[in-house]
A protein has these predicted regions:
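Short glycine-rich anion-binding loops that position phosphate/pyrophosphate groups of nucleotides
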Residues: 56-59, 82-84
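Short, acidic/small-residue loops that bind anionic groups at enzyme active sites
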Residues: 70-87
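Short beta-strand elements at the ligand-binding edges of bilobed clamshell
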Residues: 91-109
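A charged, well-structured terminal subsegment
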Residues: 105-128
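Glycine-rich phosphate/diphosphate-binding loop of Rossmann-like nucleotide-binding domains
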Residues: 1-22
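Short Gly/Thr/Asp-enriched flexible loops that form oxyanion-binding sites at enzyme active sites
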Residues: 43, 62-71
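Short acidic/histidine-rich motifs immediately flanking catalytic phosphotransfer sites
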Residues: 44-51
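Short beta->alpha junction loops
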Residues: 25-35
């Protein structure tokens, strides 16, 4: 299976545990609707220090998500469970990634932990 066999609930639990281990607060959001994702990104402005995002298939199609990430100007890290670069040619462009400081792909759930740790370090260095 491209995305593995673990459940979305297991992923949420993993992210919460990874954030707690790193000593950071996390708010989780998931939607299959592009506009709702844009709204969530915009809502992060002034309330979050950074964003970890898996834009899924919108990675390759959504200029709206790219624009929202640019507009809020928060450091963002892109995560993909699978190695998108080894997949179909149409998956080679990441619009969201153009607004991100780092991308993790092909690491499964571990990519989220790496993204949290990277973002924490990035913010600490930026605020030093």
């Amino acid at each position: 299976a491209i995305y593995g066999s673990r459940s979305f609930t297991a992923l949420q639990d993993f992210i919460r545990a990874s954030a707690a281990e790193a000593g950071v607060e996390v708010e989780l959001f998931q939607s299959n609707h592009e506009g709702a994702i844009v709204d969530a990104i915009q809502a992060a402005y002034g309330t979050a220090d950074g964003i970890v995002i898996n834009p899924a298939a919108y990675t390759h199609t959504s200029v709206a998500i790219l624009d929202a990430l640019k507009a809020v100007a928060l450091p963002a890290v892109e995560v993909h469970l699978s190695d998108v670069s080894a997949r179909e040619p149409f998956r080679q462009i990441s619009y969201a990634g153009m607004a991100c400081v780092k991308t993790y792909m092909g690491l499964g759930f571990e990519g989220y932990r790496q993204a949290i740790l990277y973002l924490k370090q990035y913010l600490e260095e930026a605020n030093a």
